[in-house]
């Protein structure tokens, strides 16, 4: 199978978009093959879908999750294909409403709406307390001053078990003093576990955790 793809680098979160139609049942396997190509250095895969009449574009991630960086990047792609739109209306996976991406092709920038947390709560995993932020479809467990490791992710994975309808989950290792975060994200359908160069939803989760504002 030959597929047309587009490699995007939104803030280091390398995303490959498959531009040809792909059946949903095949997406996980194709994403795994794409992510296994060393030269692409892909952290995730998104799929272009035929857009409905009320939007400019439609994109679905490999596991049906929401991704802010991929949304921004796909918005920029659609803007370039549609004569330089400055506002792009997108339907994206993991979000129950149309998302607007604001694009400046000349400056090479794009912004996208991010979902508000569905719930925020304190949780403990591996003997460390953190903040569990459910953004609907994707949730993150934010911990401070914990050495980033897959072992800690495995220890923390149970904190997500009570959250419904998750497509993806991540542990965000936050160094508040250095203002640096290290995201480790799992897409449930594909089983992929990836150290991401950046993470839009993880950034939102960190901001919520640092704000100290608890919704429940």
Question: What residues fall within each predicted segment?
Answer:
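A glycine-rich beta-to-alpha transition motif near the start of alpha/beta enzyme domains, typified by
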Residues: 1-108, 119, 131-134, 140-216
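Short "repeat-start/strand-capping" segments in structured domains, especially the N-termini
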Residues: 126-127
């Amino acid at each position: 199978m030959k597929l047309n793809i587009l490699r995007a680098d939104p803030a280091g979160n390398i995303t490959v978009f498959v531009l040809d139609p792909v059946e949903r049942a095949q997406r996980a396997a194709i994403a795994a093959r794409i992510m296994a190509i060393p030269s692409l250095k892909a952290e995730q895969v998104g799929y272009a879908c035929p857009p409905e009449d009320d939007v400019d574009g439609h994109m679905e991630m490999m596991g049906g999750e929401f991704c802010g960086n991929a949304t921004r990047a796909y918005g920029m792609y659609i803007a370039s294909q549609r004569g330089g739109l400055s506002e792009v209306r997108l339907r994206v996976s993991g979000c129950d409403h149309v998302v607007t991406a604001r694009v400046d092709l000349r400056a090479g920038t794009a912004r996208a709406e991010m979902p508000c947390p569905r719930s925020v709560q304190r949780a403990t995993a591996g003997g460390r307390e953190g903040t569990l932020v459910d953004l609907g479809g994707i949730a993150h467990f934010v911990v401070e001053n914990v050495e980033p490791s897959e072992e800690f992710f495995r220890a923390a994975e149970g904190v997500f078990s009570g959250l419904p309808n998750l497509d993806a989950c991540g542990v965000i290792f936050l160094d508040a003093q250095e203002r640096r975060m290290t995201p480790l994200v799992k897409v449930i359908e594909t089983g992929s576990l990836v150290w991401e160069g950046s993470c839009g939803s993880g950034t939102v989760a960190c901001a919520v955790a640092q704000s100290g504002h608890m919704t429940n």
